[in-house]
Amino acid sequence: MKNYSKNATHLITVLLFSFVVILLIIPSKCEAVSNNMQPLEARSADLVQEPRYIINVPPRCPPGSKFIKNRCRVIVP
């Protein structure tokens, strides 16, 4: 009977320890989630950069060819 009580004591100790660890971990996880729950405008305000002006510049073609209809075409003399 002594062996069973020793196992039960060990089991209760392990369960209590894991319960305390869970109580310590859960609040930190909830805090991280609440920080992430800010409105999208507040979070994306830091990420917004000034708009870049896109200039449509045709690609450079190799010598002897011209850019015609979105492609480099070889001009035959």
Swiss-Prot record:
Pfam families, alphabetized: Secapin
Keyword Repressor applies: no
Propeptide: 33-52
GO cellular component, one term: extracellular region
Signal peptide start-end: 1-32
Tissues expressing this chain: Expressed by the venom gland.
Subcellular location(s) of the protein: Secreted
InterPro entries in alphabetical order: Secapin
Cysteine pairings via disulfide bonds: C61-C72
Keywords on record: Disulfide bond, Secreted, Signal
Principal location listed in the UniProt entry: secreted
Function statement: Nontoxic peptide.
Family to which the UniProt record says this protein belongs: Belongs to the secapin family.
Name the record gives this protein: Secapin
